[in-house]
Amino acid sequence: MKGNRNPPPPPSGPVPPSPTSKNTAKYTNKDGSKFITVPKMNTPIDSAQPSPTASSLAAKPALPPGPETEPPQTVNRKKQKRRAKAAAKAAAERAQNSPAINGLPSPSPTNDQQSADADPEDDEDEPGTGHDSGNQSLYLNGGAHGGAPGKSKKSKKKKKKNATGPAGGFPNNNPYAQDDRDHSPEPILPPPPPQQNRPGMSREKIWNTNSQEERERIKEFWLGLSEAERKSLVKVEKDAVLKKMKEQQKHTCSCTVCGRKRTAIEEELEGLYDAYYEELEQYANHPNQGEGPPMLRPRRSFGSMGGMRPRGLHSRFSNHQPSRGRIVDELEGDEEEEEVEAEAEDDGEGDEEGEDVYSEDELEDDMYSEEEQEPSEELHRSDYAADFFNFGNSLTVQGRDRLPILPSFLQNYPFSGTGNNAYGSSSLGGILTVADDLLKNDGKKFIEMMEQLAERRMAREEDARGQFERAYDHPNGERYVHSHPPPPDEEEFEDEEEEYEEDDEEEYNSPDEEDTMTEEQRMEEGRRMFQIFAARMFEQRVLTAYREKVAKERQAKLLEEIEAENQQDAQRKAKKAKDAQRRKDRAAKKKEAQAEEKARREAEKAAEEAARRAEEARKAEEQRAKAEEKRKKKEAQRKAEEEERQRKEAERLRKIQDREEAERKAREAREREKKTREEARLREKEAREQKERKDRERREQQERERREKEAKAKAEREAKEAKEAKEAKEGKDTKERRKKEERAAHKAAALAPAIPVPITLPKRSATQQPPAPPVAPVPVLPQQSTSYASPKVPVATPALPKAPTPMRARQTSQQDGSTASSGAASNSGSMASQNPSPHPITPVHASPGLMAPPSKSGVMGIGSQGSAQPPSHSASPMSFPAKLLPPQHSPFGIPPMGSAMSYPPPGLSQMPLGFANPLHREPLFPPMPGFRPASGMMPMPPGLNGPGVNRGFPLHPPPGFLGGPMESPAPSMAQAMSPGLQRDNQSPHSRQGSGSFDPSQPISRPTPIGRPASVVQGQRPSNWSPSSGPPKPEPEAHLGSRALLDDLDDGPQDFPGRLSRGGSAPGPRPAPGFPMPPFGMDPMFSHNPWAPPGVVQPNLFGPHPPPSFSPLSAHTPMGMPWGHAMPSASTFGTPGAVDRPIEPRSVAVRKMLRRACEDLANAGSAEGRDSFIPLEMIKVQVENFNHGYPIDEKDLLDICETEGNEVNGGGSFDVVNDGQGGRSIRFVSGDQRTAPQPVQLAVGYNPGSPIGGGR
């Protein structure tokens, strides 16, 4: 603490000498595991050593004391110095007189062993001191180096707190001042006890310099170097240190004092190095000089050491005599520090890379901790030279006998002590670490340490001066802020020095006078100190060079050993590879033998297999030959059969053609004959009609005159009666009059002629026409014949009596003479229904009616209206004979089965049953829309789903459906087989049935009331009727869903026999054998007007042929004429065969075409299945399938272009030209080929020939 002159002793220190041995001292390690005993002269104990201050302890905590440490004894300082000096001289004499081992001086019992056995692992065992592994003890100037006046206790305390910096003004460029700065608070440790070699050193003996062989090798290495190589090892230091010092000080303070400080450092370093080089060179020239160190003359550069003032330094510092007393550092933790130093030595030696122990952080921490210490009150009595000596003492030089290459003056130099404060007593790590810093870091840390020491020294001088002035009342009372105060007067300094010396004398209570050192001794001491420093640096460089050489040798040897090992490995691998190859060869030979054996067995087996296969092939060939021969025979037989069949087929076709030709000729002859007869009959009829017309005109004239008279009388009576009942019956008369007018209009329209030929109507007599009653009674339905069983209830329909007509149809000449009123009434009633359409331009159609009940005269009332029109086929379809055979009665008035066709229909007695006469191939009569039951078939009773009330023609198809009465395949058959040709006897009154769809009539007389003509799609006027004129093209109207279709959506229209779209309505088909009723007429015993057609036929809704001639059904060959008998069709009996699903004609023809191609390809007619077959052969085959009815080649080619699917047989047809104008066809089966559906010839179904158009 500040001002504490007598602090308590440090907690740890060297063990005092035992009382039995006064000349020895025992030092132990911190943990007591190591101890060493050294002579007492080597371990002088300063009794006046101060304890560290609180700040220094805070900056660097003291290590715990060892188990045997005690506070040191307090001895007289002056006596201690004298004893140390004597001991140093004695040690020097002993070193000179003792025998050298291998040219080396005998080491002390502690230092040599300590330096050799420095423990590098204590840094790990004691982490508390690991960062101070390179620390060195601070050796200050002691009594052994001169007789400088002793210092007071204050001065010693000040030196202890600032032990890192010298007291003098020597700058901080000394490389070994780093130990002073970094470890100033650390106590001086005793040398550690001997230790065993570490395992690392045993593993790397290359760095072990303890053995005699190693020393000999180092010596030989040194002696083997040339002069230039030796100089190169030691010449580097001076230039490197000076260069680095200049670089580091370029940016420092540029004041005069700092400049002088730098100059002094450079000069001192240069002088020291020059002196050392001269002595080293002298030693090199005289290597065996071992008598004492040569004493060189003092140089100019050593003047500062001897108290001379350096250049530029004030006289105050030069006049001051350096103190003889040395500043002793703390003794606390001596043992530990010695061990740490030893560890640093070994670390530095064992590491090739020379790891630097000093770190910049540690340097800064130590620097700050020292700067933070409060300056003590003691004054520093040292000057520039004394600081340099202190710096020299801080250079830890150890193991001077390590290497045999040092000069003899250094080897035999007698140090003043070998203990804690001796130069060679501490670890080698310090000097070697500083040397490593110079070698590896270019002395950067060394230069920084010297600068820091210089700065702190100047700061301490400033503080000391300030404290001195405050303590002793400076007369001027001046305070200087700058770190370089002006030098005080010499007189004042002398007074202060005297007072300080007095305080020292009083404090130590020692009457002895301090010894004084001469200038020459100080110079010699400083020179020797630097020589030791330089020698250790030189030793480090030699040792480093030797290590590098040994490392290279060891590396080369290691490479040789590695190469030898590689060769051995290669030989071993080669041997293994050879053995493996030998084994592989043996295995390969064995495998080859096995393969040969296996090949032999396989060859034998293959030979057997080949023989067996040859035998099998021979047998297969024989079987193939037999099969081929059999196939050829079968093929020849099949060809013969096919040729025979084709010949027969050709013969049959020829016969068919001949028969058709004969039939055609016969038909043409019959048609010509019939035409001739018809022409004759027409001529006769025209003549007869002309005569009748004249008679009728005459009678009509008479009748008209009679009626006029009667009418006049009647009009008078009626006028009279009307006048009487005018008021009462005015409304009723008006209504009756309107009805009369309406009836008159209807009668006029019914009696109007088809062709407006001017005729003269004779008046009828009054007796021939009964007078009309004033009030028309409501008539009832006429009495029906009991021979008709009507399933419907008759409904009475009110009707007015007919108005008188201006004309009356004349009775035919074939009628009986009796003209009963009932017959006339029946005739007039039937005549009223001849024109159901009231429009005047509607042509008159024959109104078919049912067979009327027998009249009184025994003649069936089938309509007996006479025809007085010209022979241009007017409304009367044909002329029936006046007298008919009496009917054959049966229950319900139905003719017996088979008797209806025993005689031809009226007017067709000359026709053959088959209607093959050419006359009926032409539209001779207008189409009769009525219906007549066939022979053996029950006629339709009135009201039993027949043609319908007041409708003797079939309904036209709905809009969009094709077909009609004009599209019947045989219109003449519809005319010939219509049952009621003259009358519609179902209604006794003359009312027009609603829903009439008759063609329009030519223009006639205007009538009061007229209805617009009914326009029905698909119905056209007769193309042969003279009243309608020539046929006019009518654009086809698209109605219903057909209006939404495009014109092309209806498919090919020109295909013969093609069914139109929508040709079949949903519903069940009729049983085979029943005829298909026309559209609008229900089938018998059915009430579904939309019953579907039973078979596919070209005309779906038109009138059908007679039931005995079955329509196009499954039993009718395609294109078969109407005159041919059906194969097995019955009129009203069981069907000839089972019905089958109906398919379109194009599908059936395509299937037959495919079947024909396949049959011809399989029959061998072509070269193969992929060959083309001529179209003529295919056509013949298809006609054979079609029962000989011809099919056009163009139709076949068109069908070939259709795409195959699962319905029409699949596949496709290829058509090519054979180059001669012919075509050939080939069928190619597709991926989704379906099995062809064979045509069932047993049922007699064929789609029909395109030529026939499906007739």
From Swiss-Prot:
Disordered: annotated span: 1-214, 285-379, 470-525, 563-898, 956-1080
GO cellular component: cytoplasm
Major localization class: cytoplasm
UniProt biased composition (Basic residues): 76-86, 151-162
Coiled coil region boundaries: 547-745
Matches recorded under InterPro entries: Fungal_stress_NST1 (IPR051195), NST1 (IPR025279)
Localisation: Cytoplasm
Biased composition (Polar residues): 865-877, 983-1004
Keyword check for Cytoplasm: yes
Segments of skewed composition (Acidic residues): 118-127, 330-376, 488-518
Skewed-composition ranges (Low complexity): 50-61, 87-96, 811-835
Alphabetic keyword roster: Coiled coil, Cytoplasm, Stress response
Residue stretches of biased makeup (Basic and acidic residues): 201-214, 470-481, 590-630, 637-745
Keyword Nucleus annotated: no
Pro residues bias locations: 1-19, 187-196, 770-780, 1067-1080
Family: Belongs to the NST1 family.
Function: May act as a negative regulator of salt tolerance.
PANTHER family: LD36051P, STRESS RESPONSE PROTEIN NST1-RELATED
The protein, known as: Stress response protein NST1
Organism for this UniProt entry: Chaetomium globosum (strain ATCC 6205 / CBS 148.51 / DSM 1962 / NBRC 6347 / NRRL 1970)
Gene: NST1
